[in-house]
Amino acid sequence: MNTRVLTGITTTGTPHLGNYAGAIRPAIQASTQPGVDAFFFLADYHALIKCDDPARVARSRLELAATWLAAGLDPERVTFYRQSDIPEITELCWLLTCVTPKGLMNRAHAYKASVDQNAAKGVEPDDGVTMGLFSYPVLMAADILLFNANQVPVGRDQVQHLEMARDIAQRFNHLYGREFFVLPEVVIAEEVATLPGLDGRKMSKSYNNTIPLFEGGAAGLRNATQRIVTDSRLPGEPKDAEASHLYMLYRAFSTQQESMAFRRQLEEGMGWGDAKQALYERLERDLAPMRERYVELISNPGLIEDILQAGAAKARKLAQPLVRTLRDAVGLGALQPAAAKAAQPARKAAKDARFVSFRDEDGSFRFRLLAADGEELLCSVPFANPKEAGALMRRLQDEAPEQALRGHDDVSYAAWLDGKEVAYGPQAADAGARDALLAKAREALAQLAAA
């Protein structure tokens, strides 16, 4: 069975050389591997959270689609579609919203960062916070779960959202008594190439130090390479290749043999002007054919639209049967005669508490104890590997709940093993609320022990 890998493409801004080397090129290369069903989508609904300029959103969709196609994405081999062309995504988003606890969304990093910024400014915590920003992780979960993606490659800043998608999928599966959703695996992109910008810092639009991918043509590329900051060593003086931004850029686009030859030239005293020209020529050799294709595509948006519509049709063939199944599961299926409905076996209500494990954004492993209604009752300390976390989950089930779970202070409680706190309960409003949560957590552990 093939592995489904899903990649979302944010449709804000114009791609630069760093985007290509760090995300576009490796994703396209990965899509050609045997045994992989690759899904790529333009996340234009997500773009509306960050941008309220319709012209910019529309232009960015065109540029991003043209860029990925020009860079070698094969729409015949992969499923390439636009998020807004798949109505099943928004329908699933609502079904998932109805089972997602608000407390889970309260912990999302983007939301918490906005609240912290507002606190620093002395304004209301939710000032300027839209429901789009607040519920963004649910839409992301719908993007992933609709196609039952097995793997989702992300940077560390997105790990939490993937873990939330797993949590939401588990809650839905548990509530409606079937494994409707595959739990997606977080694939952290550890080897993502980070290119230096014109000033040596990470290439980023935020630093205004980017090298254009296609924008400005060959002249724009040449102009950018000429503006790369170098040290003051003169022609004839040996250069330190490892400390050179020029060398790092050259190495990212050259073969090992080419890279070694360029390094030798720098160490033998090649002037910075000649080095910049060599970098430009090496980049242009790769980018010129892609740029030509990009210009053709940008000038023919109808062709891109046809490709995206074909991709949407392909995607919806997979999405529609699942959504029909989910509609039936939640009671939104077609009306049936009373006799037919009576003949159907009643779905067994899901009443069990459960542990769920997840990987934190720093790479450590944790687990949560959830009540039957999905409320979080415990969150563990971090562990170096999943076996440690799993062993402690099993031990907690074997311990007497009254001994394992004890009050931490007036408004919180913790799980104790071997004299150490290994997990913490949520902070309550007062001692009475804490006692109620503690009793609920003990009941959940007892239920797990009896299962």
Curated annotation (Swiss-Prot):
It comes from the Bacteria. The keyword ATP-binding applies. The keyword Transcription does not apply. It is found in: Cytoplasm. ATP binds at T10, T11, T12, G18, N19, G155, R156, D157, L195, K202, M203, S204, K205, S206. The lineage of its organism: Bacteria, Pseudomonadati, Pseudomonadota, Betaproteobacteria, Burkholderiales. One of its GO terms (biological process) is tryptophanyl-tRNA aminoacylation. GO terms for molecular function: ATP binding; tryptophan-tRNA ligase activity. This is Tryptophan--tRNA ligase.
